[in-house]
Amino acid sequence: MLKKKIEEEAAKYRNAWVKKCCYDGAHRNDDETCEERAARIAIGPECIKAFKSCCAIASQFRADEHHKNMQLGR
């Protein structure tokens, strides 16, 4: 489900290197926020925008998935 959302977002960008920025943003990193990670990008504003967008989508998806109700069979 997350992979599909990220692929849909990456499809909005024409350049392969901008798509890569998006995919890089989707990688999990619990130690830093999306903003902190994006601050290290030196390629350009288009890459930063794609990175932040995909990072936000992935972070939101993971937060929503984390809070799903789980029943254990005992």
From Swiss-Prot:
Pfam families: ANATO. Disulfide bonds join C21-C47, C22-C54, C34-C55. It is found in: Secreted. It comes from the Eukaryota. Its main location: secreted. GO terms for biological process: complement activation, alternative pathway; complement activation, classical pathway; inflammatory response. The keyword Secreted applies. Residues 21-55 form the Anaphylatoxin-like domain. Keywords: Complement alternate pathway, Complement pathway, Disulfide bond, Immunity, Inflammatory response, Innate immunity, Secreted. Residues 15-44 are annotated as: Involved in C5AR1 binding. GO terms for cellular component: extracellular region. Transmembrane segments: none annotated. Mediator of local inflammatory process released following cleavage by C5 convertase. Acts by binding to its receptor (C5AR1 or C5AR2), activating G protein-coupled receptor signaling and inducing a variety of responses including intracellular calcium release, contraction of smooth muscle, increased vascular permeability, and histamine release from mast cells and basophilic leukocytes. C5a is also a potent chemokine which stimulates the locomotion of polymorphonuclear leukocytes and directs their migration toward sites of inflammation. This is Complement C5a anaphylatoxin. It comes from Bos taurus (Bovine).
